[in-house]
Amino acid sequence: MMNRKQTVGVRVGSVRIGGGAPIVVQSMTNTDTADVAGTVRQVIDLARAGSELVRITVNNEEAAEAVPRIREELDRQGCNVPLVGDFHFNGHKLLDKYPACAEALGKFRINPGNVGRGSKRDPQFAQMIEFACRYDKPVRIGVNWGSLDQSVLARLLDENARLAEPRPLPEVMREAVITSALESAEKAQGLGLPKDRIVLSCKMSGVQELISVYEALSSRCDHALHLGLTEAGMGSKGIVASTAALSVLLQQGIGDTIRISLTPEPGADRSLEVIVAQEILQTMGLRSFTPMVISCPGCGRTTSDYFQKLAQQIQTHLRHKMPEWRRRYRGVEDMHVAVMGCVVNGPGESKNANIGISLPGTGEQPVAPVFEDGVKTVTLKGDRIAEEFQELVERYIETHYGSRAEA
């Protein structure tokens, strides 16, 4: 197990980031925040999927006015997930005009690159920090390379040009991202915001750039760090890029909260980004969220797609039931279920899982032995193998985790 970098803990409502706390999964809505009903629905969907913080855009007066109503409705429906307000350009004005918005949020996100331009930058940044202090809210100082503070970049470019051997431009840009975050954090502390109210992020869109920036940032501060590619992309590309970047950093003990910034397919479920974040952490052994289904990829021995459908059915069922099971069955998230397609690895993997089934491959007897804790307990046959195995999984959870449930 890797050793986590010790950072200063930051509390966001009931959630703790850093300071040795479990790595927090967060997400962001893509609704118009002024649409209270639509935003509430999506926040609840994300929270139900397992998001522990949900960020919402606060970009205009209508959005700022809606935030307290969103919080009130979430509370009414029993959803206590903290909301993070995402501010760009005009946050100082919105927080000044709508104090109820500030009170309803669990955290503010500030981008130093667009909090103000020229002579307005420092006063507007100071206003945002003063509101955070007034309402006792933590802040994420989130630097994005695509909206980098140009005054910081210009200063570092000038310094670089005076060197006998100037550094390459990409290296200077990476340093500018880090410098912007660290200097902004220092200014925030100078304005009265304690270190235990500050989270930092330095997001890039490239995997190698992100790794390089966070390795340097982590070595130069003990602030809690938020990890994520700023624009991961769509589909498998976005998932692979996020996994590649975050896994390298997490393996080094870097990172206290993560968000997977996937571009969703039109009409697709927004909660995919939550599932990907959870699966990165769970497959790395950093946290457990839902029982893991182990299944083989299939080959010429498994010309039927029966085992693939069963594996998908079981995984979907487990994830759907987890909000209920998490309350009733303590430890169920650590369970392993094997759904294997033939006799080559099927019995072995099934024995190593908490419960597993080895389905018949091509040319094998049409029977499916089931193993529980390494012991063969039953052999399933006929047309109801899928339904019967799902019932066995439910029974296993009830008998093995029911007694652990908290009163």
Swiss-Prot record:
Which coenzyme or cofactor does it need? [4Fe-4S] cluster
Q: What is its EC number?
A: 1.17.7.3
Q: Which reaction does it catalyse?
A: (2E)-4-hydroxy-3-methylbut-2-enyl diphosphate + oxidized [flavodoxin] + H2O + 2 H(+) = 2-C-methyl-D-erythritol 2,4-cyclic diphosphate + reduced [flavodoxin]
The GO biological-process annotations, alphabetized, read as:
isopentenyl diphosphate biosynthetic process, methylerythritol 4-phosphate pathway; terpenoid biosynthetic process
Q: Which Gene3D superfamilies match?
A: Dihydropteroate synthase-like, Sulfite Reductase Hemoprotein, domain 1
Q: Where does [4Fe-4S] cluster bind?
A: C296, C299, C342, E349
Q: In which pathway does it act?
A: Isoprenoid biosynthesis; isopentenyl diphosphate biosynthesis via DXP pathway; isopentenyl diphosphate from 1-deoxy-D-xylulose 5-phosphate: step 5/6
Broad enzyme group: oxidoreductase
UniProt keyword terms in alphabetical order: 4Fe-4S, Iron, Iron-sulfur, Isoprene biosynthesis, Metal-binding, Oxidoreductase
Q: Name one GO molecular function term.
A: iron ion binding
Q: What InterPro entries does the record tag this protein with?
A: Dihydropteroate_synth-like_sf, IspG_bac, IspG_bac-typ, NO2/SO3_Rdtase_4Fe4S_sf
Listed PANTHER family = 4-HYDROXY-3-METHYLBUT-2-EN-1-YL DIPHOSPHATE SYNTHASE, 4-HYDROXY-3-METHYLBUT-2-EN-1-YL DIPHOSPHATE SYNTHASE (FERREDOXIN), CHLOROPLASTIC
The record's function comment reads: Converts 2C-methyl-D-erythritol 2,4-cyclodiphosphate (ME-2,4cPP) into 1-hydroxy-2-methyl-2-(E)-butenyl 4-diphosphate.
| Family as reported in the entry's similarity comment | Belongs to the IspG family.
Q: Which HAMAP family match?
A: IspG (MF_00159)
Protein name (database record): 4-hydroxy-3-methylbut-2-en-1-yl diphosphate synthase (flavodoxin)
Question: Organism, per UniProt?
Answer: Methylococcus capsulatus (strain ATCC 33009 / NCIMB 11132 / Bath)
Source lineage? Bacteria, Pseudomonadati, Pseudomonadota, Gammaproteobacteria, Methylococcales
